[in-house]
Amino acid sequence: MTKSLYLTAAEGNVGSVAIVRTVIEELKQRYTNFGVFRAFTNGPIEHDIAFKDALDAAGLLDELDIAWGSTRQAFVADEEESMTELVKRYTDYSHGKDAVLILGFLDGDPLTPGMLPRTGRAAANLSTTVALMLSGALRSGREIEVATRLSAAEMVKEHAPVCVALVSSAMEDLELSKPERYITFTDGEKTYLTDEEKAKLQAAMEKESEVVTPLSFQASLISRARSDRKRIVLPEATDPRILQAADELLTREVADIVLVGDAEQINAHAAELGVDVSKARIVSVDDPELNEKYAVEFARLRQKKGVTLEQARETVKDLSYFGTMMVHMGDADGMVSGAINTTAHTIVPSFQIIKTKPGAALVSSCFLMLMEDRVYVYGDCAVTTNPTPEQLAGIAVSSAETAVAFGVEPRVAMLSYSTGTSGKGPDVDAVVEATARAREMNPDLMIEGPIQYDAAVDEAVAKTKLPNSPVAGKATVFIFPNLNAGNIGYKAVQRSAGAVAVGPVLQGLNKPVNDLSRGALVEDIVNTVAITAIQAQA
C-alpha cells in the first residue's frame, strides 16, 4: 500500500519552500519509488511555480502533467465534481508508488475562506494523514500550540487527522509541552533534519488514516483490483454505459475486459461514443467452438433436469448463460451483468451453473454502505425473501466474510425489534436461533443478536442495553431478519443519511457474479467490476 502524507500550510507565509524541499530531500532517500502530488493548482499547472520547484527538488519534473488533482477555480465552481477528479487522478498517479507527498496550500497560494476545511475534506478523501506548516516567528511555544490546535480542529471536523506540525522561523529556546508532535525550523533556509526529526517525519508518513469516505473507499476498490488484474466478462456490450465503463476500466488497468457480442458492431458503436475498447477481448455467442464447449458442459450439469445437448446449444446463446459459462469454464474470472437484463435473468444462471461454494448455506447478497467516514455491510437486502434461522446464520457468516474481503473488521449485529432478552415471539426466536447457529458455523465471529439498530451503532445506548457486548455500539455488519426489512433499511439509510450504497454484492457463489441496477451509471459499473475482480482474487 502506498504511504502518503498531506503537507499543507495552515496560514500564510510559513516558509513552505524550505520546508517542502527539506521534507522531499529526506523522503526521496527513504523511498525508492517516491512521488510528489499537488492536490489543487492555481490555474494552469505550468504556471504553478511552487509545485514545479517541489518536483524539481524530487527530480520529477517529467511528471508535471500527471501529478496534480484539480484547480482551485474548478473546486470553487463544483466541489463534488472537482473532488471526484482529484481522487481519481491521485489514485492513478499513486499506483505503483512506494510513497507520495501530497502538497496542499503553499506560500503564494490565495488564502480563501474555508481553506482549512477544504483541505481537510481533500485529505480525508485521499485517505491520508496531515502535516501542518505554521510560522513560529515572534510566537511562544504556547501560542504555536494554540494555533496548531485550532487548525487541527478544523481538519478533524472533516475527518482528517493531523499527526505532526512543522514550524518555521522558530525561536532557539522554544518550549513546547508536546515536542514529539513538532518539527521546528530555526533557520529559514534549513535543508536537513536531525535523526529525531527524521523519525517524527517517518512516523507521520507511515501512519495510516482510519477514516474511510465514500470516495476513498471507491478509490481503494480500484487500487486493489489493479494489484492482481482479473478477467471480467460484460455480456451486455450493446449498452453504451457498458462500453464507456469498459473504456475506463481498460485505460486505468483495473481489469481485463471480455465483451460479448459481434466485434464489428461493438467497435462501430464504441467509435460512435468516442471510447476505446480495442484492448478488450470480444467473443460472440455464435462462436462455434465456444458454443459447443459450453453446450456440452451445460447439458452435463443439467442432465438430471432433462436438458438435451440441442437445448443446451440454444440456452448458452443467451447472454447471461454464455457469460456465466465463461466464468464456470475458466475463460473469465467473474461476470457483471444487469444493465439491460433483470436481476433474475442475471443470477439464475449462476445458481444453476456456478452454484454455492463449499460451506456456504445459500447464495445471498449484501450492500456496502459508504457512510461519511466509515463502511458498513448490510445483508440480505436483495435476494433471500424470508430466510430460515439456518439461512439467516449463513447470511451472517457470508456477510462477515465479505466485510473482511473489503477491509472492514466484522462485528455482526443480528437485527431485531428487541435487544437481548427484552422481547419474545417467533420473530425474536428466529434471530436467537440464527445467532446461535452462526456462532456454531464460525466460533471466532464477533456477533450479537437479537439487537436493535440503535444499540448496534450507538455506544451510549449499548452501555445501557448490552454493556458487556463486544459488538453493541460498534457493529459494522448488519443482518436484517428478512428481505422486506433489509431492502427498506438500506434505502432509508441511503436516502436519509446520504450514504452511498454499493451493490448488491452476491456472496456464497463458487465464482463471482454480480448484478447491476438497470439504472446503473458508468461509475456504478466500474465499481461493480472492481468488486467482482477483488472477489475473484480471494
Where would I find each of the regions flagged by the language model?
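Anion-binding alpha/beta catalytic cores of soluble intermediary-metabolism enzymes, centered on
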Residues: V211-A472, V477-A538
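Flexible phosphate-sensing "switch/lid" loops adjacent to ATP/NTP-binding sites
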Residues: M1-L215
